[in-house]
């Protein structure tokens, strides 16, 4: 929550800390008109197309049918457009990635793209774009930025919605200066890493619960009398 609030404050409202640690725009920071974006942005900022800021790994995606997944049950998450669909016995990605729904359910109730942050060993099907920033130091900014794009600006189709590579990569984004991006990552990344550790601990405990509960139910395991 804090990461999203800080993103909105700094990169949407433009009230990042200035040289005097005061909110930039609210304190009269210089704003200039950007013709490509058709809006005012802070004086030292610029713009770019998303294709110049991110790398896509869609060519490495491999879809598996439900029948195939049934034959390959395992421990590695199998991701679709909106979340984990199954667990399989192999993986094609290992590390931190950002997923953005490509088709089917492409946006949430508020009209923003469905974006997931994943890490570890996993498998991703062909219904989610797989993304990292060209400078992987800016992963947290990229995650929040993608979540803030109005989906209607990159979607096509009236009934069956789709976010194509072309539309995604052609999106025109505000590009903050690198110093501010570094500051954002320095604040947010430690919080995110702590959150990841908590999620991993919860998942480990849930797995232990699921393994022990049937044994307790049928008397194969005894509770510690202490």
Describe the predicted segments one by one.
Residues 37, 84-86, 105:
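Short beta-turn/strand-loop junction motif enriched in small, turn-promoting residues
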